[in-house]
Regions:
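Acidic-histidine catalytic/liganding microenvironments
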Residues: 4, 8, 91, 125
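Conserved core segment of the aminotransferase class I/II
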Residues: 6-78, 87
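Residue-level recognition of strand-loop junctions within catalytic nucleotide-signaling folds
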Residues: 34-35, 65, 108-110, 149-151
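Conserved glycine-rich beta-strand-loop-beta hairpin in the small C-terminal domain of fold type I
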Residues: 57, 61, 76-85, 96-109, ...
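A short linear hydrophobic-aromatic micro-motif
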Residues: 92-96, 129-134
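PLP-dependent enzyme catalytic core of the Aspartate aminotransferase-like
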Residues: 121-129, 136-173
Length: 173
């Protein structure tokens, strides 16, 4: 939208290394916007959030200078997200679209029941922890967020997804 005529002055674009480069927990990101918006944003961010650690800044700098290191992650996550969609969509009443990138699946379980109950059920029955979509805002009810980046080994990720699938197939409202 910022490239459209007259929109740069009204657009704030936020980039996160956490999701885009797998830097979860390092709290590195940046904003692109016009100066009249940036000045108050910068002052607020420094006062509220503080500064990013030196180690995180160095890691981000290296990542930007050597983008090839991300290729191995892209390949692994591409395989995982395609397999996750295949496994989870095999459950009647469960719907998941292929994530555009990254390691998070947004799973619609609304046809099966309450997402809070289902998340607790999966922890107990499948022994896999998932996030209740309700924690991500009003539109998250009926959804689960599943992280595909927990293990290095693909087979452990796929085994966890299969355990989720098997538990959901047994789930009764």
């Amino acid at each position: 939208p910022a490239a459209l005529p007259g929109m740069f002055e009204r657009t704030v674009t936020v980039f996160s290394f956490s999701k885009g480069m797998g830097f979860s927990g390092l709290r590195v990101g940046y904003i692109v916007c016009c100066d009249s918006i940036m000045d108050p944003l910068f002052a607020t961010a420094v006062a509220v959030v503080g500064a990013t650690s030196t180690a995180a800044q160095q890691a981000a700098t290296v990542a930007l200078q050597h983008p090839g290191f991300m290729k191995q992650f892209e390949t692994a996550y591409d395989k995982r997200r395609h397999r996750a969609v295949e496994i989870l969509n095999s459950v009647p009443g469960v719907h998941v679209m292929l994530p555009e990138s990254g390691f998070l699946c947004w799973v619609d379980v609304s046809e099966l029941g309450d997402s809070t109950e289902i998340a607790a059920y999966l922890t107990a029955e499948a022994r896999v922890s998932v996030n209740d979509g309700k924690n991500y805002g009003q539109g998250g009810a009926g959804h689960l967020r599943i992280v595909l980046g927990v293990y290095r080994d693909d087979e452990r990720v796929f085994a966890a997804l299969e355990a989720v699938r098997d538990a959901l197939l047994r789930y009764k409202k």
